[in-house]
């Protein structure tokens, strides 16, 4: 155990550094040792560093490939979506055209039906007007006939006297006798 502790004890006898400064003695600065260590680090570190850089490069290239594949997939999906959109737009246009033509047909049918209904309503109305006109004409004729009959009766009553009345009766009796004689 003594052998293990001896190097540490010997460290306690070394003089401590006086601080930072530049040492101009080449042998004390250990430039050769530093350059050897640096050369070894460069020689072995170069391989490690190049391996790290190659791994990083591979990861970046793989990420770029994956991104390009995802981009191609997205472009394919976009094209499919655009094609689907075009189909949907064509179908929507057809539906709109068909809908507009259907609306026009139904509008024309509705107008024709309304026109037919008006004609059907006009016929009874015209018949009613005609029958009302006929009834009015008949009433006017009856009133005119009654007035003419009243005037005629009034005129006859004012002009007829008893003598004319007796002569008319005699004349009518004579006509009846001749009619009876001709029938026998």
Swiss-Prot record:
Regions that span the bilayer: 31-49
Keywords from the named record: ATP synthesis, ATP-binding, CF(0), Chloroplast, Hydrogen ion transport, Ion transport, Membrane, Nucleotide-binding, Plastid, Thylakoid, Transmembrane, Transmembrane helix, Transport
Keyword Transmembrane appears in the UniProt entry: yes
Note, other: In plastids the F-type ATPase is also known as CF(1)CF(0).
Entry keyword annotation includes Cell division: no
Purpose: F(1)F(0) ATP synthase produces ATP from ADP in the presence of a proton or sodium gradient. F-type ATPases consist of two structural domains, F(1) containing the extramembraneous catalytic core and F(0) containing the membrane proton channel, linked together by a central stalk and a peripheral stalk. During catalysis, ATP synthesis in the catalytic domain of F(1) is coupled via a rotary mechanism of the central stalk subunits to proton translocation. Component of the F(0) channel, it forms part of the peripheral stalk, linking F(1) to F(0).
Designated name of the protein: ATP synthase subunit b, chloroplastic
Membrane-related topology note: Single-pass membrane protein
Gene, per the UniProt record: atpF
Subcellular compartments: Plastid, Chloroplast thylakoid membrane
Subunit structure, as described in the record: F-type ATPases have 2 components, F(1) - the catalytic core - and F(0) - the membrane proton channel. F(1) has five subunits: alpha(3), beta(3), gamma(1), delta(1), epsilon(1). F(0) has four main subunits: a(1), b(1), b'(1) and c(10-14). The alpha and beta chains form an alternating ring which encloses part of the gamma chain. F(1) is attached to F(0) by a central stalk formed by the gamma and epsilon chains, while a peripheral stalk is formed by the delta, b and b' chains.
InterPro entries xrefs: ATP_synth_b/b'su_bac/chlpt
Pfam families: ATP-synt_B
Family statement drawn from the similarity comment of this UniProt entry: Belongs to the ATPase B chain family.
Primary subcellular site in the record, as a coarse category: plastid
Species name: Pinus thunbergii
Any one Gene Ontology molecular-function term assigned to this protein's record: proton-transporting ATP synthase activity, rotational mechanism
One cellular-component annotation, GO: chloroplast thylakoid membrane
């Amino acid at each position: 155990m003594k052998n293990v502790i001896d190097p540490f004890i010997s460290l306690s006898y070394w003089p401590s550094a006086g601080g930072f400064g530049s040492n101009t003695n080449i042998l004390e600065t250990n430039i050769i040792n530093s350059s050897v260590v640096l050369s070894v680090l460069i020689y072995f570190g170069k391989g490690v560093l190049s391996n790290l850089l190659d791994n990083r490069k591979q990861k970046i290239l793989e990420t770029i490939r994956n991104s390009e594949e995802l981009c191609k997939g997205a472009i394919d999906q976009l094209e499919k979506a655009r094609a689907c959109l075009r189909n949907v737009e064509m179908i929507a246009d057809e539906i709109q055209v068909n809908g507009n033509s259907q609306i026009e047909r139904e509008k024309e049918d509705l107008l024709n039906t309304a026109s037919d209904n008006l004609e059907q309503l006009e016929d009874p109305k015209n018949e009613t007007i005609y029958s009302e006109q006929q009834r009015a004409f008949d009433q006017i004729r009856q009133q005119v006939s009654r007035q003419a009959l009243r005037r005629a009766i009034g005129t006859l009553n004012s002009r007829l006297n008893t003598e004319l009345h007796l002569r008319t009766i005699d004349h009518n009796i004579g006509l009846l006798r001749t009619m009876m004689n001709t029938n026998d």
